[in-house]
Amino acid sequence: MRQTVKGCAVTIDQVSKAYGHCLAVDRATVHIRQGEFFSILGPSGCGKTTLLRIIAGFEQPDSGDLTFDHVSVLGVGANKRRSNTVFQSYALFPHLSVYENIAFPLRLKRLSKNLIRERVHEYLHLVQLDEHLHKKPHQLSGGQQQRVAIARALVCEPGVLLLDEPLSALDAKLRSNLLIELDTLHDQTGITFVFITHDQSEALSVSDRIAVMNKGKILQIGTPYEIYEQPATDFVAKFIGETNSFLSTVVSCTAIENEEFMLSLQVPELDRTLTVTADNPIDPGRRVCFTVRPEKIHISLEEPGTTSAPLNVFRGFVEEPVYAGFQSKFFVQLESGAIIQVFQQHQKYLDTGPEIAWKDTVYVSWSAHDGYVVEDIES
């Protein structure tokens, strides 16, 4: 790159958008920092694409404000904003070559032929398509077509690049490779990336921060670590990755060291109480959602011994073992009838005894520090 492009800071302030009686975006507020790789993550129909279209200028909000670098762009047409969009469908001109597709927006700006040539070759090199400049879109693979679409969106050097689920039409391996390339492009250009996806692994692997949406609302904004390890609502806990969640009632709350609190929870589905640490005190009697990730649960054929840290131990049997490459997934039915999911590397890699098999009686356990309590119960 000749020089790093200055990305835009984007602020969405109390933005709402309805289609008839359907509220697609409900008072969304988020500040996207200059040069950030920011993902908007949520299930189909949650409003994330509508929000992206509002940023792009394809839709106008019913209320609220939208600013680029602290200047409102409401009423400013899509072609006048410092943003470009990469669509899921690529939207390439089938009769134009790779070179001509990328050059098209520069020609609309009436730049000189020399500058167009220089800029197109620069971005062709950036997306590793130097050898394909004379090919038509139908002569390219899906991944190559998507690279052309990305180069065309970047060649005008916008302040914001909007990516509307750009990888969803590609196979898993190609998605993984292009995701790495997108992250590299972001680092090389300095442009603000706003990435729309329903795929949690995509968002977690490349984002500086993530906004999780559901039913038109932004439920949580945070780093990938915060979203995964410290979910703000039970929906976020269940939607991001896989987890075991149980509605619970706080029985007691005791202050412990390191400014933490030890909670005792009554969990009807498990038919007993369990312990979990929390950063903040929670009043006894409060209904909460307890969650523990499958990879944080230990599974064994023998009952665990006593430990210095409080340990939650349950007995059950393996209802279904699932081979998943480097690890196994176990669905364990506890004595209460509840099902708990456990992830563990294969026993042969761990060298900790015989493989656990279907119908084996097992013990599942986790430390009080490995669970998490969510106070905001949405679902």
Swiss-Prot record:
Q: Which residues form the ABC transporter domain?
A: 10-240
Give, as one word, the top-level EC class. translocase
Q: Which SMART domains match?
A: AAA (SM00382)
List, alphabetically, the SUPFAM superfamilies matched.
Answer: MOP-like, P-loop containing nucleoside triphosphate hydrolases
Q: What is the lineage of its organism?
A: Bacteria, Pseudomonadati, Spirochaetota, Spirochaetia, Spirochaetales
Q: Keywords for this entry?
A: ATP-binding, Cell inner membrane, Cell membrane, Membrane, Nucleotide-binding, Translocase, Transport
Q: Catalytic activity annotated for this protein?
A: ATP + H2O + polyamine-[polyamine-binding protein]Side 1 = ADP + phosphate + polyamineSide 2 + [polyamine-binding protein]Side 1
Residues holding ATP: G42, P43, S44, G45, C46, G47, K48, T49
Q: Which InterPro entries does the record cross-reference, listed alphabetically? A: AAA+_ATPase, ABC_SmlMolc_Importer, ABC_transporter-like_ATP-bd, ABC_transporter-like_CS, Mo/tungstate-bd_C_term_dom, P-loop_NTPase, PotA-like, PotA_ATP-bd
Q: How does it assemble?
A: The complex is composed of two ATP-binding proteins (PotA), two transmembrane proteins (PotB and PotC) and a solute-binding protein (PotD).
Tell me which domain of life the UniProt entry assigns to the organism this sequence originates from: Bacteria
Species of origin reads Treponema pallidum (strain Nichols)
Q: What is this protein called?
A: Spermidine/putrescine import ATP-binding protein PotA
Under Gene Ontology molecular function, one entry of this record is: ABC-type putrescine transporter activity
